[in-house]
């Protein structure tokens, strides 16, 4: 008689709670430091890669490793070795490393430089954004970005590691004007009619302060985009 094989039941996911201000997993206190992801800068030269740190949504086509497209198991190993408990995730300050020059000019072409700091939104294939690629569609999630976060969260969870995802990035909407010019939410960079003034309202021809407009949920289009994004 053929032996019947019963598949193993998947174990329940660890339960993470906050009790008396302390983060616990399955009632056990979690202890360790945090790692804030790089969100700008970077070079592809070998001597620079030695000094790089993990960034799970950094992308370099065809190349893997620290400072490039990080291997997720290597990121987890890095955190365990250095007693890091939390990976604090931000999307990139900008996608194209040419903007590291902090200029506010429109790029004349889409000859972008890596490493690329991925954004949570996908491209529309329509029009031309400030950095020379197609405009974003804020209703279209960047599947690669979110799949990378999901992969880290699932694999890291097995080793008691946590992912803190920052839904928003104040650096884009305050301070240096270059932080705003390539932002997916800027009206000229998307197909969603976000309603931010164009040309960009630089203060003193340099700084940007659009936080009040950005978080103004009385604007019907932006309110719905925020709702879809954070749900």
Predicted regions and their residues:
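Active-site mouth of glycoside hydrolases
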Residues: 17-231
